[in-house]
């Protein structure tokens, strides 16, 4: 019996959207929800930007956005695209010619802001460049940069103004027979963002890129993004996400995956389940978890690890994880493997031992997945 049948209260039914591509990455439809970030280097610092793109890709980024504010950045973009392991989205504001240059430089997608890209004639030129160079586009509406006529009409940024901006530019793209586009309606206010995205989801079948813009620093921005994006994703809205933080782009990727993991929408790496610790703990839970999270960052295989300080909840949690450790007494605890009690291990040796067991379990899971893929391939009829 499937997990969905056993636990119907965990089901999330994703909104049906058209599928487009950003380079080789599918967005929308039944594709996995893509996780992306944006570089914060000067684009003209080619080595620094490439290094940041690579770090983001290593952390799991499917797509990376790069700002293109001037001609020198357009020139730099060509080499960045060539060296990037993931598709590059060119972030375009004010100067429509930067969009044309970015398309010609090989960007996989052009993000334009309806609030500052200019009139329809300029947008048409960007559309032509995108079509000629096999680029997709994102209409990126921001509450902080709405068109003047919409602010005059609605008096302030509101969901209606943001959606109207998006729909106006959708019409321009569709009138020019361009359909490889996604939409975003971002604001720094969680309520405003959520309302705009919900209305937009009802108004179009275009894939939606989710984000709470200018969310804040690592802690506050993570909380705000988790609430805003998490609620939308729970409702089935969203095809790609970017967590905007005043922090290292790698942190944005980590938070993005953690949000998706929490909702069961996408899994990557080790999901650590740990207690907050109390006087009952049989070892230092907090320091142990910090050490394990750092040492297990290289694991890409989706799996779970429970680190629980005592026997109140430890054995029960361990039964539901791939690897588990529950604190006991006399300086040792119990190791659980594949949900079963296995053996005791001293607290002193526990961290090294758990890392070893996680790596071993990851290899086992990878082998199982490879075998299943081979069986599926063997069952497919020859063309």
Curated annotation (Swiss-Prot):
Enzymatic reactions: (2E)-4-hydroxy-3-methylbut-2-enyl diphosphate + oxidized [flavodoxin] + H2O + 2 H(+) = 2-C-methyl-D-erythritol 2,4-cyclic diphosphate + reduced [flavodoxin]
Alphabetical keyword list: 4Fe-4S, Iron, Iron-sulfur, Isoprene biosynthesis, Metal-binding, Oxidoreductase
SUPFAM superfamilies in the record: Dihydropteroate synthetase-like, Nitrite and sulphite reductase 4Fe-4S domain-like
GO process terms (BP): isopentenyl diphosphate biosynthetic process, methylerythritol 4-phosphate pathway; terpenoid biosynthetic process
Recorded metabolic or biological pathway in which this protein acts: Isoprenoid biosynthesis; isopentenyl diphosphate biosynthesis via DXP pathway; isopentenyl diphosphate from 1-deoxy-D-xylulose 5-phosphate: step 5/6
Cofactor: [4Fe-4S] cluster
EC numbers, comma separated: 1.17.7.3
Top class in the EC scheme: oxidoreductase
Molecular function per GO: 4 iron, 4 sulfur cluster binding; 4-hydroxy-3-methylbut-2-en-1-yl diphosphate synthase activity (ferredoxin); 4-hydroxy-3-methylbut-2-enyl-diphosphate synthase activity (flavodoxin); iron ion binding
Superkingdom to which the source organism belongs: Bacteria
Binding note for cofactor: Binds 1 [4Fe-4S] cluster.
Binding site for [4Fe-4S] cluster: 275, 278, 310, 317
Function field: Converts 2C-methyl-D-erythritol 2,4-cyclodiphosphate (ME-2,4cPP) into 1-hydroxy-2-methyl-2-(E)-butenyl 4-diphosphate.
Family assignment from sequence similarity: Belongs to the IspG family.
Protein name: 4-hydroxy-3-methylbut-2-en-1-yl diphosphate synthase (flavodoxin)
Organism lineage: Bacteria, Pseudomonadati, Pseudomonadota, Alphaproteobacteria, Rhodobacterales
């Amino acid at each position: 019996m499937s997990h969905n049948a056993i636990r119907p209260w965990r089901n999330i039914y994703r909104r049906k959207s058209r599928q487009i591509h950003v380079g080789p990455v599918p967005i929308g439809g039944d594709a996995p929800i893509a996780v992306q970030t944006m570089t914060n280097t000067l684009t003209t610092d080619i080595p620094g930007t490439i290094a940041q793109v690579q770090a983001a890709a290593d952390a799991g980024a499917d797509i990376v956005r790069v700002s293109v504010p001037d001609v020198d950045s357009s020139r730099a973009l060509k080499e960045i695209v060539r060296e990037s392991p993931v598709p590059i989205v060119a972030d375009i504001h004010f100067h429509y010619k930067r969009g044309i240059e970015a398309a010609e430089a090989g960007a996989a997608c052009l993000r334009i802001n309806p609030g500052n890209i200019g009139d329809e004639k300029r947008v048409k030129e960007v559309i032509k460049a995108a079509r000629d160079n096999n680029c997709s586009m994102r209409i990126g509406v921001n509450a902080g940069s709405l068109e003047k006529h919409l602010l005059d009409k609605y008096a302030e940024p509101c969901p209606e103004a943001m959606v109207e901006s998006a729909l106006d530019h959708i019409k321009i793209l569709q009138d020019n027979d361009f359909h490889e586009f996604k939409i975003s309606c971002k604001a720094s206010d969680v309520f405003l963002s959520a309302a705009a995205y919900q209305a937009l989801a009802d108004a179009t079948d275009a894939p939606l890129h989710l984000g709470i813009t200018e969310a804040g620093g690592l802690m506050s921005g993570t909380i705000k993004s988790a609430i805003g994006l998490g609620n939308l994703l729970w409702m089935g809205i969203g095809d790609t996400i970017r967590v905007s933080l005043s922090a290292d782009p790698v942190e944005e990727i980590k938070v993005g995956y953690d949000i998706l993991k929490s909702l069961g929408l996408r899994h990557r790496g080790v999901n650590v389940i740990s207690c907050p610790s109390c006087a009952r703990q049989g070892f230092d839970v907090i320091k142990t978890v910090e050490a394990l999270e750092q040492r297990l960052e290289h694991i890409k295989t989706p799996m779970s690890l429970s680190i629980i300080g005592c026997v109140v909840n430890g054995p029960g949690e361990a039964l539901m994880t791939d690897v588990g450790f529950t604190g006991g007494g006399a300086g040792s605890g119990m190791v659980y493997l594949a949900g079963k009690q296995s053996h005791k291990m001293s607290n002193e040796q526990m961290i090294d031992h758990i890392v070893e067991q996680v790596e071993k379990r990851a290899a086992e899971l990878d082998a199982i997945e490879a075998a299943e893929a081979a069986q599926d391939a063997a069952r497919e009829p020859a063309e």
